[in-house]
Swiss-Prot record:
Keyword Nucleotide-binding: yes
Assembly with partners or alone: Monomer.
Protein name: Cysteine--tRNA ligase
Annotated family: Belongs to the class-I aminoacyl-tRNA synthetase family.
GO biological process, one term: cysteinyl-tRNA aminoacylation
Record-listed E.C. numbers: 6.1.1.16
Binding sites annotated in the UniProt record for ATP: K253
Binding note for cofactor: Binds 1 zinc ion per subunit.
MF terms in GO: ATP binding; cysteine-tRNA ligase activity; zinc ion binding
UniProt main location, coarse: cytoplasm
Gene Ontology cellular component annotations, sorted alphabetically: cytosol
EC class (word): ligase
């Protein structure tokens, strides 16, 4: 990931959030955990982060699940929205600057669609849905590399595309809203584009995030709408994370092959998944296995020990090394960053390593020795000076137990 941050200090950033009809799986957290770490690295360099994250709380899947359970869409989405917020806390992910539910902004979304209609980018399809005409956008395909010719509908003599997408779906099934376009609800691509347009006051984002699976059609269609209204791309920089597979197979609810984030947190230290996600370059697929989890469990224990050892040897951190590693994370060069961390570990640069871990927001960096325990380090130092190593080891072991349980 290469970001153009020249002459910028305030960054506007957006990440598509979950569709809240069920619990999120561990793969859903890859982008937001990476963002959480990168944002802290950027703040360390003096950047201010304005981060918008949406909650999709109206969708066909939500309606179907609510009807299946015999409850309202609002009851269902409130439950899973709150569950998602709990997950963010458990995995030590800072809440975004602003979280917005789609249903809170229906009027703004309708206004957005009106602007697209007024500018002549829409038509009604055979179902009487209001649809966006992608052929009106000369650079459609610029985000995903799609060729417009390949998207044309052969049955309409090349005047329409199979990929024209719904702005407003006409329906009275489940939750619906009044609008000039009829009773219905907005399309997913339009929800995100409208929220970005409204919250960031028509400006292009500095960074838009999401999974690689969203490049087409979602990101392409967001960009098309923003370009239609402003003549500018929706984002100057894109960050996309690769797939997270489980035991060699795609992790997906539809395939019944998932590891829920809450189940992961019950079984493992949440820092383990942060370590995994920050060890592999963002776009590279990850195959989550017991062996990989076990390896990173050992790594986290090693990192914890380094933070403990810092109390016994608080030499000055090497600021230039901290900056070098954090810059690599910002650039998405995670493998190189981790190589440098391992070199610093060999050199026993505990202060430098601890500073890096603080910026990557590992939960174990909150582990502390209280003032009373730190006083015991003075006794430890004296015992070392007196070459009473057995008693010194006892104090060290006692302090390690206190540190681990802090």
């Amino acid at each position: 990931m290469t970001m153009n941050l020249i002459n910028k200090k305030n960054l506007n950033i957006y990440l598509c959030g979950p569709t809240v009809y069920s619990d999120v799986h561990i793969g859903n957290l890859r982008t937001i955990i990476i963002f959480d770490a990168i944002f802290e690295c950027l703040k360390n360099k003096g950047f201010s982060i304005n981060f918008l994250h949406n909650i999709t709380d109206i969708d066909d899947k939500i309606i179907e699940k609510a009807q299946e359970l015999g409850i309202s869409e609002a009851e269902l989405t409130e439950k899973y929205t709150n569950e998602y917020f709990k997950i963010l806390e458990i995995f030590n992910i800072k809440k975004p600057t602003k979280i917005v539910r789609v249903t809170e902004k229906i009027e703004k979304i309708i206004e957005y669609i009106k602007l697209l209609e007024k500018k002549g980018f829409t038509y009604y399809n055979k179902n009487n849905d209001l649809v966006f005409d992608i052929l009106k956008i000369p650079n459609y395909g610029i985000i995903s590399g799609q060729k417009i010719e390949s998207l044309l509908d052969k049955n309409t003599k090349k005047t329409k595309s199979n990929n024209d997408f719904v702005l407003w779906k006409k329906t009275q099934k489940g939750l619906f809203f009044k609008s000039l376009f009829g009773l219905g609800r907005p399309g997913w691509h339009t929800e995100c584009a409208a929220l970005i347009y409204d919250y960031f006051q028509k400006k292009s984002l500095d960074l838009h995030g999401g999974g690689v699976d969203l490049i087409f059609p979602h990101h392409e269609n967001e960009n098309a709408q923003h370009f239609a209204l402003t003549g500018n791309p929706i984002a100057e920089n894109w960050f996309r994370s690769g797939f997270v597979n489980l035991n060699g197979k795609k992790m997906a609810k539809s395939l019944n092959n998932v590891l829920l984030a809450k189940d992961f947190s019950h079984k493992y230290n949440p820092d383990i998944i942060r370590s995994i996600f920050l060890s592999i370059n963002p776009t590279v697929p990850i195959n989550l296995t017991e062996e990989l989890i076990k390896n990173h469990k050992k790594l986290i224990e090693k990192y914890q020990k380094i933070c403990f050892e810092w109390y016994f040897d608080k030499k000055n951190e090497k600021t230039e090394k901290v900056e070098q590693v954090l810059n690599l994370f910002i650039e998405g060069k995670f493998a190189k960053a981790n190589f440098l961390i391992m070199e610093l570990i060999k050199q026993k640069e505990n202060s430098t390593i601890r500073k890096i871990f603080l910026n990557l927001r590992f939960n174990f960096t909150k582990m502390r020795l209280d003032p009373e325990s730190q006083e015991k380090i003075k006794n430890w130092n004296k015992l070392i000076m007196d070459k009473n190593y057995s008693e010194a080891d006892k104090i060290r072991e006692e302090l390690w137990k206190i540190f681990k349980n802090s």
